[in-house]
């Protein structure tokens, strides 16, 4: 039996998670649906992942031409529509975490599966935060709304590979404090 291969699906190489809203869906505003989301920061040196993403965007474009065309007479060229692969050096020049990297914002209305390096489910919310390193399975698809059209990125699953420096200026409690040895430490 042959396993189906979705050309619009990518499992990334090691990337860094930013704006990680993976435990609770959040709405961007009062008129939008709550979604789980993450920004995947991909080093520009990971050319294998970047090429897989570009190929998946192309596949989503070809698959979604009817949707992208909408009521128009023709399908807009891929270069003229919104795509999710963005250059951190150009779009986030003041953010060190995005230096020499591309990024993709992925979201979903359903919760992603979250596992560790051994593929064991992670239940402790403190294990996944903005700054952690891991991999993600993502899918690309065409969209056409009243205000824009393009290719979007859907979040499927997350795999944590290792801890990283927390992003957003929030430190972890276990990093801020040492173990207290003296029972009478208040005096």
Predicted regions and their residues:
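Compact mixed alphabeta submodule
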Residues: 119-187
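Structured, beta-strand-rich domain cores
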Residues: 66-147
